[in-house]
Amino acid sequence: MKYTDTAPKLFMNTGTKFPRRIIWSMGVLKKSCAKVNADLGLLDKKIADSIIKASDDLIDGKLDDKIVLDVFQTGSGTGLNMNVNEVIAEVASSYSNLKVHPNDHVNFGQSSNDTVPTAIRIAAVAEVTNRLLPALQQIISSLNKKAEEYKDVIKAGRTHLRDALPVTLGQELSAYADAFQHEHEQVMNILEYVKELPIGGTATGTGLNSHPEFQERVINEINRITGLGFKPANRFRAMRLLTDLLLLSGALRNIAVDLYRLGQDIRLMFSGPLTGLNEIDLPTQEEIAGSSIMPGKTNPVTVEATLLISAQVVGLDHANQFASMLGEFELSMGIPLVGYNIVTQVNFISEALEKMSRLVIDGMVANVEKMKRYAESSPSLITIVSPVIGYDKATEIGKKLNKGMSIREALRELGYSDNEINKILDLSKLVKPGFTAK
């Protein structure tokens, strides 16, 4: 394998290999191209059949150890394409007892400039469809179930990390369920853009040295194999610009940001048990020791691992922004890096969503009495009488509350009866619109 053997001297050798999904997508693409070229009478059927058989080996993961070239290579991804071409040619030759050539046969009617941009989009769509979308549905379902379970559990609201008006735990969880639902819809919409494939563009998008029907036929064959509904792209756009993948990266970043926020809220509610909030318990987090020196300590380890994942996904999105700007005229120069990053982002965020759902949210237990006690002792409750006595007087009462006077005592000084005060301090009325003091 002349190219593959020589390239490591010139490329980077960081040990960063292409993920399984991209190797799989290259196998799907090479298989599809071989079949179409044979059907068009442009490739000997026996050679095509041997390429298809070798491509199946690549699809099934049997040749992964032979895809050795680093992600940090030529910006077109020629290293990946030629590595795959040479591996398939070698295996196909052994199957057919014919001399299968990596360029003349495996790469017939193709260029690295259209194959790798096509393959990374196939990989992205497949990974999102098979992993991310189910993981999003899982966390949406988990959050909605917990929101319903705790819809009447009142807790202190907090803004700026200071006491604020009460909310319910269900309301807080519903916010994240709604956010992830919107992000699920956003990803679905973006995916339609990513499904546009530039195969058939060959070197510069014109399609020179490929059959006029090649693009459409190859995409039909890819759809037959994957069932993912790909369609032809404007080849000139999809070979020079990676904007569709950048949109997907941005959607993954948004999921990571909201997942980070959810994780931070859970960590704070789990803080304690004696000197923190201690508003929730997370039984699964007690399965391993939280400290190597403090016996009995438990930490929100799954949540913290999720925060690290979120940080990495956001960082990879920033790298994608920069890599998407690389290139001039007919071709992007960030193709292998963006492809690698996107699949990595999808894998990382899907893993985090799945484990947050199963190990954290599903098992979350509210400390109901602790939450109620915090809610009833919050100085922000003065807000409920503000519409009646005015903002200035309410502020004065707030100062008294901060000095230790209870809100009941303050309201009595204003002439409210105990019966009226009980009605005012019915916290269930404070978590929905209305003027409870009137």
Swiss-Prot record:
UniProt main location, coarse: cytoplasm
Cross-referenced PROSITE patterns: FUMARATE_LYASES, LRR
Keywords, alphabetical: Cytoplasm, Lyase, Tricarboxylic acid cycle
Molecular function terms, GO-annotated: fumarate hydratase activity
Organism the protein comes from: Saccharolobus solfataricus (strain ATCC 35092 / DSM 1617 / JCM 11322 / P2)
Residues involved in substrate binding: 76-78, 101-104, 111-113, 159, 292, 297-299
Catalytic activity: (S)-malate = fumarate + H2O
SUPFAM superfamilies: L-aspartase-like
Task performed by this protein: Involved in the TCA cycle. Catalyzes the stereospecific interconversion of fumarate to L-malate.
pH relationship of activity: Optimum pH is 8.0.
Record site: Important for catalytic activity: E304
Enzyme class of the recorded protein, top EC level: lyase
Active site, renumbered: H160, S291
Subunit structure: Homotetramer.
Stated family: Belongs to the class-II fumarase/aspartase family. Fumarase subfamily.
Extra remark beyond the main annotation: There are 2 substrate-binding sites: the catalytic A site, and the non-catalytic B site that may play a role in the transfer of substrate or product between the active site and the solvent. Alternatively, the B site may bind allosteric effectors.
Gene symbol of the encoding locus: fumC
Places the protein is found: Cytoplasm
Pathway annotation from the record: Carbohydrate metabolism; tricarboxylic acid cycle; (S)-malate from fumarate: step 1/1
Protein name: Fumarate hydratase class II
GO cellular component: cytoplasm
